[in-house]
Regions:
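Amphipathic alpha-helical scaffolding segments comprising HEAT/armadillo-like alpha-solenoid repeats
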Residues: 1-15, 36-48, 70-89, 98, ...
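Charged, low-complexity interaction regions
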Residues: 18-23, 92, 152
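Residue-level detector of extended alpha-helical repeat arrays and alpha-solenoid scaffolds
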Residues: 21-24, 39, 53-58, 97, ...
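Short, solvent-exposed linear motifs at loop/edge-of-secondary-structure regions
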Residues: 22-25, 29, 33, 106, ...
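Alpha-helical solenoid scaffolds in large eukaryotic transport, assembly, and signaling factors
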Residues: 24-59, 63-76
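Core register positions within helices of long alpha-helical scaffolds
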Residues: 30-33, 59-67, 100-106, 132-135, ...
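Long amphipathic alpha-helical scaffold regions
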Residues: 51-68, 127-159, 185-193
Length: 193
């Protein structure tokens, strides 16, 4: 039977929370198979905390991410990642965007690094973007390229110094040494740590 993405999402959400593991896996498999469109659709249902409850939608997105990070279902991962990235860009609520970033960090790849790095200067999302970049394998080249840019803010230097430490990136040492000259106390502390 041919069901639309809208129908699959509505049917899946109606079954949550799942009664047991079998139902959970079936629902998550169906939702994950809707790909980017389904993920974006569910993410669009998230509302600011003062406007309603997001538990079912967060449960669904978290479940889909967990489902596609299982090696048995990895073929569905790319479309889910793309949906999360698009949802982050479209979402207007910072807390919900932070939640979406927290999910992205479980399934992101190095191909997503530039999209995540765009948020490093966002006052609310910088920490979430940074954690996603740090937890994503293969982002070292992008982080080094970011460090080589002119006119980096102190906040950006602190974020990059943290990322370099977390990734144990020895190639970043020349940047860190250069940044120490004239660094404010917070930046110097992050570089030394």
């Amino acid at each position: 039977r041919q069901r639309t993405t809208e129908t699959i999402v509505a049917d899946g959400l109606a079954q949550l929370p799942a009664a047991d593991a079998k139902v959970f896996n079936q629902v998550m498999g169906e939702l994950a198979a809707t790909g980017s469109k389904g993920v974006e659709m569910i993410a669009a249902m998230l509302v600011p905390a003062d406007k309603g409850k997001n538990a079912t939608f967060e449960y669904a997105l978290n479940g889909v991410v967990a489902y596609v990070t299982d090696p048995a279902h990895e073929a569905l991962r790319d479309d889910v990642r793309k949906g999360l990235l698009a949802a982050i860009d479209r979402c207007g609520d910072d807390a919900n965007r932070a939640f979406l970033f927290s999910q992205l960090q479980f399934c992101s790849t190095a191909a997503d690094a530039a999209a995540m790095a765009r948020y490093l200067d966002d006052p609310y999302l910088a920490g979430y973007a940074l954690r996603a970049l740090v937890s994503t394998p293969g982002t070292e080249a992008l982080l080094l390229a970011e460090a080589g840019k002119d006119d980096l803010t102190a906040a950006r230097k602190q974020a990059l110094a943290y990322a370099f430490a977390e990734k144990r990136l020895a190639a970043a040492e020349p940047f860190l040494l250069t940044w120490l000259e004239g660094a404010d106390a917070q930046t110097a502390e992050q570089i030394y740590n």
